[in-house]
Every structure is written in structure tokens, then in C-alpha cells.
Amino acid sequence: MEYLNTAQELLDFIMRCKSPFHVVKEAGDLLNENGYTKLEETKEWSLVPGGKYYVTRNESSVIAFQIPESAFSSYQIIASHSDCPTFKVKGEDPFVTDGHYTRLNVEGYGGMIRSPWFDRPLSLAGRMVVRDGNSVKSVLVDAGRDLVTIPNLPIHLNRDINNGIKYSVQTDMLPILGDETAKDHFYELFLPDTAKEDILSMELYLYNRVEGSIWGASKEFLSSGRLDDLQSAFGSLKGFLAAKATGQVNVCAIFDNEEVGSLTKQGADSSFLTETLQHINAACGKDTIAYHRDLAGSFMVSADNAHAFHPAHAEKYDPKSRVYMNGGVVIKPVSYTHLTLPTIRLV
């Protein structure tokens, strides 16, 4: 069945996307395969009718767009995010040792349930900045194997564990890397051919090594880590690549740092989208008034996950607006308007 093929394609996509940098690399590969040209923010853009392009920022956010063959009068945008709730390695010397074990100093990144991170195979991925002659370059890295774990105390030493535990990241959740010698060859796990002194900085994130699965009596459900928001990033890319721009510029944006407020230079609250649309406007020979007119007629979908109804906790849900798995697209209208536009834009 076709939906099972698509579901497996999503799971495969998620397994390749182990950090925001890997998400943008994967998106770039898909765009390249479909005839898109990569642009640079620092260079002049030369766009043609029917052209397909994309631009990245910080290697962790990407905006792709299609120029229609004829004149356009609006932008049709779908946006998602590349980051996921996880743990981030802290600092350039993250090793915590006690003479027997080496642990990694980490901090929580984004909103998550902490308990599922215990007692399972975890690994690390992200990027490192290395010396390259008289310059520097960024290199994507992935340990690619079961590397660390966060062990629970045995129940004999923690009889209250099934009564509810408040976990401290700094006390309970520093992952064990290895014995006391582990820090001596840590960097070799990622860049075995690069001298330690040539590795200048790093951004590493934990990821769950357990693969996602399709389950249920009729294979109707799917489970995986990083569904928030790689599910939407995957669906947005698939829909965007299948669409054809006619009378409007189609735009697919995947932003970083949604999980921590979107306030970075590559976040959704940055200038990245606005400046990209301004670049498009100028490269297509349109003036500022035309840009504002086109913007006023544009439409944007912010694509993220929704929480489905939990049958064991009906009291937690609105009595009328309940979401069920496989029930279709969810629209979130709320009075404080953070999630949707006025009703007229939803019709």
C-alpha cells in the first residue's frame, strides 16, 4: 500500500536527519536531485522564470522557492523546523570524570519528556569547525554507532522510581561515554584523520539510535523519535517538490531553533525569510511597492505536530476539539492568535 511506502520513507528520512545540520544537508540533496540551484546570501541573485532555487543560513535553516513561468503576485509559503527536543553537549571541554568513568556535560534543548532517554542506545551528531590551511571549514559529523547511554539507578537503590521522579539533567542525565580514557580519543570517533588541535569548535546533539517503526493491528500507526518536527519538514518538502508555481512563488522554509524560541539569526523570528523574499523581489525586477503588495496577498502555513487524544486521559482534552490519529490535517485556532490567522484566512 502506498501509504506504507510513504511512512517508511519518512522513517528513513528521520534516521538520516540526526541534527539540524543533517536535516538541511538532506533537504539540499533532495533539492539538488530535483534540479534546484543553490544560492548564496552574500552574492547577487540572477533568477529566471520557471527557475528553482534554495538558500541556507548557518547550515541549519533552508529556504527553497520556485519562480513561476509568468508574472507573480504573491508568495505561497509553508514553514517547519529542523531542530528537535534533545540534549546538547556543553562547551569545548565537556568531559566529567571521577577516575573510573567519563561522562559528557550536556544541557536540555527544547521541551521534552526526560524519562524515555534512559537505558537505551544513544549517539552524537552535529558539526565541527576545523582548521583548513589558513582558513576554517565546517564538517558534519556523526558517530554512527551506539556510543553513550544514560543509565537509571537500579530499583533496589531507588524504590520510589515508580512513584514519579523529577530528573535533574546535571545530576541524573549526564551520558556515560566510557571509562576514564574515553576523553583521550573522543574526537577520533568523529574525525579520525584530523588532529585534535585542528578541531576548533563543535556543536553536538544526542540522538536516539532506536529506529522508528510502523505498528498497530492494521499497520495504521507510526512511532519515532524526532517526529517533532521532522514529520512536517518531510511532508513540506514532499508537497513542495510535487507542486508547480502558477501565478505565485512557492516557498518551503525549514527553520532552526524553534524549540528554544526562534530568536537566532537562523530562526523563524529572524530576518531570513523576509530578506529572502526581498532578494527574490529585487532579482525579478520588482520595486518596493510591488513587494509589499505581493506580501499582502500571500499565505503561509506553519507546519508542526499536534497532540492526538490519549484514551487513558480524556480529562486533559477539550470536550469538542479532540484530535485522533489518522484523522487528517489539524488546524489550531486559539484566542491568543499565536497559531492561526483570522478565520477569513482559513476558509
Model-found features: residue ranges?
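Soluble metallo-hydrolase cores and metallopeptidase-like ectodomains found primarily
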Residues: 58-64, 69-72, 131, 141-224, ...
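N-terminal capping segment at the start of a domain
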Residues: 1-21
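A glycine-rich helix N-cap at a beta->alpha junction
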Residues: 273-296, 300
